[in-house]
Structure formats: C-alpha cells, structure tokens
C-alpha cells in the first residue's frame, strides 16, 4: 500500500513539473520573439527593401524559429516587420525593454497570451517612450510555435511612430 501511494505521489509530482515546464517554454518562445522584434540589433545589416525576395528570407532567418508559416505570412502581409524595422532603424538604440504578461487563457489546442511591451527609443538628444500591446496564440503542437500575432493598432506606439 505504501509503495502504491509513493508511486502515485511521484507520478503526480512528475506530471506537475512537466506541465509547468511546457507552459514556461511557450512563454519563453513568445518573450524571445518580442525581444527580437523590438531589439535594435535585430535590424542591423538588413538588406534593402528593393531586394524584396532577399528581405523576406532575411526576416524569415531572424523570426522563423518562433512562428508558423501562416503567422509569418500574416505578419509580412501586414508589414509588421517593416514597420518595426523602419522605426527602430531610425533610432540610435532601444533601451529599457520591459515585457509584462497581462493575460493567459488556455484554449483547445492553443494558449492565448496578451502582453504589454514598453521600451525606449533613443533618438539624437531625445528619448521616446514606447508601449505596444500584443496578443499571441501559441500552439500546443509544432514545438510551441506562435500561430497568431496581433498588435493593437489603436493603442500601440509603433504605429504612431511609423506614421511620423
């Protein structure tokens, strides 16, 4: 009887650890994607926009490990990468990146995360405070890749800075 109880407790603890680690991996994937998206170093040595085919491959090599093909294609179609590239490349640096998870919802087959991302753009002699609001669907399969990315355009600073 004692062996059975010990075995059951060991199984429960093991399952708890595995579930906790897998959820952590999903969050790490999203947060790594966000850091790369807003990082100044990401856009160094980018090919020019005139070389469209090469530019797509360049973005894919930088962000492809985090995204499914559909998510990558949608971000390209919405010009999200080019907007971040234009705004961040115009700055002399990005500092104080702060990523805050504001929501997590478990759904059938994926987890929905929402984040508030704040950072500072350094320009000439000024600092611009940026706040972007992002939502992600992360698949339970496919190595925890991001299936969907939404950036709220009414409240996110990146769109206001891009229009300037």
Model region roles, listed by residue range:
Residues 17-20:
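C-terminal motif of bacterial Sec signal peptides marking the signal peptidase cleavage site
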Residues 23-86:
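Core segments of small alpha/beta cavity-forming domains
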Residues 41-45, 117-123, 138-142:
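Beta-strand elements of well-folded, non-transmembrane domains
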């Amino acid at each position: 009887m004692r062996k059975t109880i010990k075995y059951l407790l060991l199984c429960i603890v093991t399952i708890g650890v595995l579930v906790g680690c897998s959820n952590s991996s999903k969050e790490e994937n999203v947060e790594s994607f966000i850091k790369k998206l807003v990082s100044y170093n990401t856009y160094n040595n980018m090919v020019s926009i005139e070389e469209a085919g090469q530019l797509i491959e360049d973005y894919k090599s930088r962000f492809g490990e985090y995204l499914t093909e559909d998510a990558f294609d949608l971000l390209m179609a919405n010009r999200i990468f080019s907007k971040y590239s234009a705004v961040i490349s115009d700055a002399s640096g990005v500092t104080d990146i702060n990523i805050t998870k504001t929501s997590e919802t478990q759904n059938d087959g994926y987890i929905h995360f929402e984040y508030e991302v704040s950072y500072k753009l350094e320009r000439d002699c000024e600092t611009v405070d940026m706040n972007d609001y992002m939502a992600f669907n992360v698949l339970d399969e496919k190595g925890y890749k991001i299936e969907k990315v939404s950036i709220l355009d009414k409240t996110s600073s990146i769109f206001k800075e891009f229009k300037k």
